[in-house]
Swiss-Prot record:
InterPro entries documented for this protein: Oleosin
Subcellular location: Lipid droplet; Membrane
PROSITE patterns: OLEOSINS
Membrane topology: Multi-pass membrane protein
The name this protein goes by in its record: Oleosin Cor a 13
Gene Ontology BP terms: lipid storage; post-embryonic development; reproductive structure development; sexual reproduction
Tree of life domain: Eukaryota
Species in which this protein is naturally found: Corylus avellana (European hazel)
Similarity field: Belongs to the oleosin family.
GO cellular component: extracellular region; membrane; monolayer-surrounded lipid storage body
Pfam families noted in UniProt: Oleosin (PF01277)
Main function: May have a structural role to stabilize the lipid body during desiccation of the seed by preventing coalescence of the oil. Probably interacts with both lipid and phospholipid moieties of lipid bodies. May also provide recognition signals for specific lipase anchorage in lipolysis during seedling growth.
Length: 140
């Protein structure tokens, strides 16, 4: 019983019949997947061979049509993406204004307070500079 798990771990110590069964199973699975793969490849080559003259004949129509359709699709996707972003932002703002505390509200409040304190600090510095400038020009 102790030898059985060891046999499963080391393929060199497995019986020859197990190795043959594994090889046969692998060959069967590989072959059964290789046949449809080859058929699909052959079908693709045949379809491309038949369609190439049509592509060449209709390319003055197809190329602009593909470009136009691509631009239309990209426009709709971009429009939808921006619409989703706008709805998300408006929803976040609504939750923030109503006090529901959306994700990131703490960071926004912290940044707002930091900005307000810097603005006050700059205002005080400007007032000090203005007073120094006024007193300096009066003394001259």
């Amino acid at each position: 019983m102790a030898e059985h798990p060891r046999q499963l771990q080391d393929p060199a110590h497995q019986p020859r019949s197990h190795q043959v069964v594994k090889a046969a199973t692998a060959a069967t699975a590989g072959g059964s997947l290789l046949v449809p793969s080859g058929l699909i490849l052959a079908g693709t080559v045949i379809a491309l061979t038949l369609a190439t003259p049509l592509f060449v004949i209709f390319s003055p129509v197809l190329v602009p049509a593909v470009i136009t359709v691509s631009l239309i699709i990209m426009g709709f996707l971009a429009s939808g993406g921006f619409g989703v972003a706008a709805v998300t932002v408006l929803s976040w703002i609504y939750r923030y204004v109503t006090g529901r505390h959306p994700p990131g509200a703490d960071q926004l409040d912290h940044a707002r307070m930091k900005l307000a304190s810097k603005a006050r600090e700059m205002k005080d510095r400007a007032e000090q500079f203005g007073q120094q400038h006024v007193t300096g020009s009066q003394g001259s």
